[in-house]
Amino acid sequence: MEYLLPIHILAGTIALLAAAFAICSEKGKKIHITAGKTYYWGMVCIFLTALPMSIITSNVFLFLIAFFSFYLAFAGRRFAQNRKGIAAIVDWIAVGLMIAAGLGMWVLAVFYSIENNSQYITLTVFGFIAIALGYTDYKTYKQQEATGKKRIARHLTNMLAGTIAVVTAVLVVNVDIEPQWLPWILPTVILVPVISWWNWKVMK
């Protein structure tokens, strides 16, 4: 744990800075692509450190959040790379794990609710998002629609959602707000409308 946590924090910082560069740079240009790759590998490092930390501490909440957050970066990168819109086996596996993580969050939310742990609200919301995004990507793959503007929109949605996950982690660690679930949900409430607007702009 003493080595994993500093690496985890460093990776989160790198991912957040890289995401900012990717968002602010011109799409398709070298800076955007380099920043996007840096963001992705930062998310990989976050995932690979979060998993053992969650297992060591028996933290099912963190375990599920790790899969949820990494899927967003993974799917975002896959949509950027796959211009033909034909899903590979790894894409189907990833979608299945994302939906399973969402269902797992709902199950854990029930237990948290019984225990009067207010984080059941976070799990309920994130579970819905995981299932919704996973199912949307599943339909996109099945119908082979991930080409042209639709591909860019799916890339945008997943990458920005992953960025929300990183922003959320920073907020949760550094800001003490009550109730406990509020810092987990607040970035999503504020930034999801931005994603929706950006998608509309891409698709019109």
Predicted regions and their residues:
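Alpha-helical membrane insertion/targeting regions
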Residues: 1-204
